[in-house]
A protein has these predicted regions:
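Extracytoplasmic beta-strand/coil segments of soluble accessory domains associated
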Residues: 21, 53-97
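Short strand-turn segments of transmembrane beta-barrel domains in outer membranes
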Residues: 89, 128, 140-170, 178-179, ...
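Short acidic/polar hinge/loop motifs at secondary-structure boundaries
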Residues: 97-125, 143-144
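Transmembrane beta-barrel wall of Gram-negative outer-membrane proteins
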Residues: 158-183, 188-225, 246-271, 369, ...
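Membrane-embedded beta-barrel scaffold of Gram-negative outer-membrane proteins
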Residues: 167-171, 271-286, 433, 439-445, ...
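Structural signature of Gram-negative outer-membrane beta-barrels, strongest in the C-terminal barrel
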Residues: 312-320, 352-496, 528-530, 540-543, ...
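Gram-negative outer-membrane beta-barrel transporters
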Residues: 314, 368-375, 383, 488-498, ...
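C-terminal beta-signal and adjacent terminal beta-strands/loops
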Residues: 590-597, 615-665
Length: 665
């Protein structure tokens, strides 16, 4: 609430001195020589997101494309990337620890983080390979666990389509528990999900040291609805509830245990060591592919991340050991042409294990130039080794070793083998303070991602060996941060070039000869015209294009815009503190037009949505919230693409309302 000039001044100060963890330790945002955005707990609670897409509207340059249920695809200074290893372009973490192990990502893995009860979510746009290593290619999204402190409250929420959610928070000086459960009946026919998340924490500190232990558990049981097909069918309300794949489902569980040790070494610096273990298990029906095979994937890991911050230097060592498995089994005969029926038979398609080892070291060095300028240079060297073991006959055969007609089965199992990748990332940045309220920064950075295990060992057609190498990206960025008595500004201009882009070509081979270019501007502006009104704008202008003609298409596509890459997107929030009890917010979200195919022949026109939120604090001793989403009842698509000769859409939901009440304990 902003009911007084003192509170107003405090908010200005808080926004201009946000504390972040871009370098693994807390520091003022004014010390960061690059872009970073932080969504704080207050914003997260006000948004009350039912899907991570709703919350990330508050970050310029980020689009989390909403699928069905809790599914999503990610874009951070990039198109929405699809394919077996597309998720490897982003480092998604909780408390700095990657949600999934190197080589074992999943495009939907953000639902394995407790974003609904986070103290903050931080986003770094562009490569951040020195600190985070492989997968920090297009960006980093880090979910921070809530602060351990005395607190107690329970929240109940009710909404459209039989939506029910309950949250419980209880904590003391050393312990804290955050848990929530959700049941969503689903807008689409025969869809919906049940989801539970739990975060348990223990924090103990002494004069110079601290120990912080966190346990995360997530469980998702989802009845998944598929794309609806047909040009502009998302505009037909008679079809938007239809579900062509009522048989589809996804079950996913995850556990992560971390222990962070911090030692304040005084004049010698600070030592940080975090040990962790992770376990993930997922089963889902591939309803989007011919044959609809069942995929089962799981992996478990142990590892540590460490850094020593001393004087002008930061030195770190990270290591991870992971064991992963993947199996694909088709229960029924494929429906379709004689070719599909013959080449995609029922039975086991893949069954393999991968033992992975990652070790990396990095160094950051800071040099103060004069009184107002800071130069930072850094480098990271990372080694990734995969030992792959195949448990089925090698090649394009059925599980019993017999060959398929038409030259062999679609799937191709490579022989057991080992692969290793050595990558180096660098950064050089400059931060200059013009005044206490205005600073400029510039940086030249690089990033990489090792191939995902599915890109190497889940082969198709006549490809028996995948000789792909790591993707790499180079970025140049210039930015400005400033604030005044009634405004805040954070904007950056960037240009990136990506080489060795990995994709599946028209012959169904995994290859790595793609080249793409990415450029744009991201801006965030906050304006406080008086003590009761706040206006916040997050906006991105971007252009993503193919820089060569990879075999994604039979056409020349160099210079074409990459599909699912809107040229503009963003959001505007107008918040009004009506009185000490009541607040209101009107939100406009914009998604510009984008092409649905590499040939740029099919286009989605984009859409604009309005959302309304009302809050009552302390009314009858409780806190109340009302959200009305898609106030104008716009007909739109959350995602549009063109595949198998058809337009396909994940349909946006019509106007809907959610009511919540929070009761203190």
């Amino acid at each position: 609430m902003l009911a007084s000039s003192a509170a107003f001044a405090e908010r200005i100060t808080a926004l201009s001195e946000i504390v972040v963890t871009a370098s693994r330790i807390q520091e003022s945002i004014s010390s960061v020589s690059g872009n970073i955005t932080r969504i704080n707990q207050e914003t997260r609670e006000q948004v009350g997101h039912t899907h991570i897409n709703e919350l990330m509207q508050r970050v310029a340059g980020v689009w989390i494309s909403r699928g069905n249920g809790q599914e999503h695809l990610t874009a951070i200074r990039s198109p929405v990337l699809t394919g077996a290893g597309a998720c490897g372009a982003f480092l998604l973490a909780q408390d700095g620890i990657p949600i999934r192990a190197n080589g074992f990502c999943n495009v939907n893995e953000l639902f394995e983080a407790n974003t609904e009860q986070a103290s903050a979510i931080e986003v770094i746009r562009g490569p951040s390979g020195v600190t985070y290593g492989s997968n920090a290619l297009h960006g980093v999204l880090n979910v921070l666990s809530p602060e351990v402190k005395p607190v107690g409250k329970v929240t109940f929420e009710f909404g459209a389509n039989d939506y029910l959610r309950s949250k419980l928070i209880y904590g003391g000086e050393r312990y804290r528990a955050d848990m929530h459960g959700t049941r969503d009946g689903g807008y689409k026919d025969e869809s919906g999900f049940d989801q539970q998340k739990l975060t348990l924490q223990r924090h103990v500190s002494a004069e110079q040291t601290s120990h912080h232990t966190v346990l995360h558990y997530t469980n998702l049981n989802q009845e998944t609805a598929g794309f609806i097909r047909g040009a502009n069918i998302y505009r037909d309300r008679g079809q938007t509830r239809s579900n062509p794949n009522p048989e589809a489902f996804r079950d996913a569980r995850s556990i992560r245990l971390t222990h962070r040790y911090t030692n304040d070494l005084g004049a010698s610096g600070e030592l940080l060591v975090t040990g962790y273990g992770r376990w993930s298990d997922m089963v889902f029906l591939q309803h989007f592919l011919p044959g609809q095979a069942l995929e089962e994937n799981r992996h478990h890991s142990i590892g540590f991340m460490s850094s020593l911050h001393t004087g002008a230097f930061v030195v770190g060592l990270d290591a991870d050991i992971t064991q992963g498995q993947l199996a694909e089994t088709q229960a029924r005969t494929t429906v379709g042409s004689p070719f599909l029926v013959a080449t995609i038979p029922a039975g086991q398609h893949y069954d393999y294990d991968v033992d992975a080892r990652t070790i990396a070291g990095f160094l950051d060095w800071e040099l103060i130039l004069g009184t107002n300028t800071l130069l930072t240079a850094g480098s990271r060297v990372e080694s990734v080794i995969y030992d792959y073991t195949n448990h089925l006959p090698v090649g394009r055969t059925r599980a019993d070793g017999t060959r398929c007609d038409f030259g062999g089965c679609r799937f191709n199992r490579p022989a057991s083998r080992s692969d290793d990748f050595l990558n180096v990332s660098t950064k050089l940045s400059l931060l200059h303070d013009v005044s206490a309220a205005l600073q400029f920064f510039g940086q030249v950075t690089s990033g990489f991602r090792a191939p995902q295990t599915t890109e190497l060992y889940r082969l198709q057609a006549d490809q028996s060996v995948s000789n792909i190498d790591s993707e790499s990206i180079r970025s140049v960025e210039f930015g400005v941060r400033g604030f005044g008595q009634r405004w805040l500004l954070d904007a950056s201009l960037y240009k990136m070039t990506k080489d060795n882009f990995i994709f599946r070509d028209t012959n169904r081979r995994n290859v790595d000869n793609g080249e793409t270019r990415h450029q744009g501007i991201d801006a965030s502006v906050h304006w406080f015209p008086n003590q009761t009104i706040t206006a916040s704008l997050q906006w991105s202008l971007a252009h993503h294009e193919y820089d060569n003609t990879p075999a994604l298409s039979g056409s020349e596509i160099r210079g074409n815009e990459i599909d699912t890459a809107p040229g503009s997107f963003g959001s505007l929030q107008l918040a009004w503190t009506i009185n000490p009890t009541w607040d209101a917010e009107l939100e406009w979200t914009h998604l510009g037009s984008y092409y649905q195919d590499p040939e740029n022949n099919h286009e989605y026109p984009g859409h604009d949505l309005l959302n309304l939120r009302l809050f009552a604090q302390g009314l009858l001793g409780w806190d109340w919230g009302l959200r009305i989403m898609n106030v104008a009842d716009e007909k739109y698509a959350e995602r549009a693409d063109f595949a198998f000769g058809e337009d396909r859409y994940f349909v946006g939901e019509p106007r809907r309302a959610f009511l919540s009440v929070t009761i203190p304990l």
